[in-house]
Amino acid sequence: MSIFHLKPLRQQTDEQLMTRAASGSDTAFEELYRRYARRLKGFFFMQLGGDEELAADSTHDVFLRAYESRSRYQEGRNVSTWLFTIAYNLCRNQYRSNAYEAQLLASLDAEPMTEQPMEVQLDAAALDQALEQVLSELPATLRHIFSLHYQEELTIPQVAEIVGIPEGTVKSRLHKTMNIIRKKLKQYEK
């Protein structure tokens, strides 16, 4: 029996908990759920159009899949990256099944962009709302990468592993996303 099994669950690393969960410990898996459920739900909420119910269902799906495949967990693998990879794949499946991107692009083409004068100044809440709107208009691939890196605070290598693309591509897509955001929010400059 290794020493980390003697520590209280809250003091164990994610990897230690996942190793215990892979060996059959439901309490260790419950602790991982406690640590990640809120972040994953927030990720789904942003990615799936702000649908609270769909975000909650998708979060449960992530943990169900993780629980079902816990015995195949590769010891030493970053648990956060593993869970967000599952979440990312669920989002991709959701987009495919709903043809979400096609609808989004069609609606963007149909709605003319209205520009407000430069003197319009927004308070922090309004700027946050404007940013959320810009993010919702981004193609899913850019939105996923932005969300994983800036909102979920994952590193570039972690994002690259989750999305399955090279780190350089992640960096260039983040740069492209930031340029789009700056351009669309330029009207809100003082």
Q: Language-model segments: which ranges?
A:
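Residues within the DNA-recognition helix of helix-turn-helix
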Residues: 36, 173-176, 180
